[in-house]
């Protein structure tokens, strides 16, 4: 989805490459130590676990049990622990300095079956001064809404592909999303612009909502059969003349 070389997909969801860059792994660890784990921990059976770090060493823990210390490849900064038996819980990669003392870490957790939908209105872009833009009732300002499928404990379900139904109430106009779901046995899944029913991709989906000329409350609700619905509210402001 999107160009393979891109750090983000068409819905602006970060790929693993984005997180690796975000950790500033190209600078010396003495300036900014960082470690990035693989995207999730939900495949069963025997598997390899990958992490990337600018530290001299990285130690892997699964449910607080150590699986050894690895030196990252000098060129790619990748380190791999092979033939690890999957078990539910928490995976942690800890970056170590030359004396093998911890200097940074990252955790990922396995998740249970899909249970609910979390709905988040993304923060608007900021001005050069750091001040956030105000959502104006000018019929052109828009905002991004993220729907995330989670388990009963609130953990993201990265394999979820539930059909999500979006509803907008109040002074907002639904503008749709980028959706090009690809899965085994279903190579392509197109949708018409403005479709309110979209299939989650990796347990996630994003849509755009535009303001009207009337200021007021905008509610976005997302539902799916068998899941607890979620919603979020934002207010558009009157234009000052």
PLM regions: where:
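Extended substrate-binding grooves/exosites of carbohydrate-active enzymes
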Residues: 1-73, 79-102
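Short, hydrophobic beta-strand segments
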Residues: 80-86, 192-213
């Amino acid at each position: 989805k999107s160009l393979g070389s891109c750090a983000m997909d068409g819905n602006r969801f970060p790929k693993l490459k984005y997180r690796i860059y975000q950790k500033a792994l190209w600078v010396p660890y003495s300036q900014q130590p960082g470690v990035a784990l693989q995207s999730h921990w939900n495949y069963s059976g025997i598997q390899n676990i990958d992490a990337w770090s600018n530290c001299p060493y990285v130690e892997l823990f699964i449910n607080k049990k150590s699986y050894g210390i690895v030196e990252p490849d000098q060129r790619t900064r990748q380190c791999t622990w092979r033939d690890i038996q999957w078990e539910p819980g928490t995976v942690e990669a800890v970056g170590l300095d030359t004396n093998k003392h911890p200097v940074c870490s990252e955790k990922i957790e396995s998740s249970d079956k899909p249970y609910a939908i979390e709905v988040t209105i993304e923060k608007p872009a900021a001005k050069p001064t750091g001040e956030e833009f105000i959502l104006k009732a000018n019929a052109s300002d828009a905002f991004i809404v993220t729907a995330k499928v989670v388990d009963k404990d609130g953990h993201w379900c990265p394999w979820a592909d539930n059909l999500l139904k979006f509803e907008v109430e109040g002074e907002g106009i639904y503008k749709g999303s980028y959706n090009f779901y690809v899965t085994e046995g279903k190579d392509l899944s197109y949708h018409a612009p403005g479709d309110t029913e979209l299939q989650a991709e990796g347990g996630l989906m994003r849509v755009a909502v535009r303001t009207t000329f009337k200021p007021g409350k905008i509610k976005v609700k997302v539902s799916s059969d068998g899941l607890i619905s979620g919603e979020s509210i934002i207010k558009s402001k009157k234009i000052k003349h």
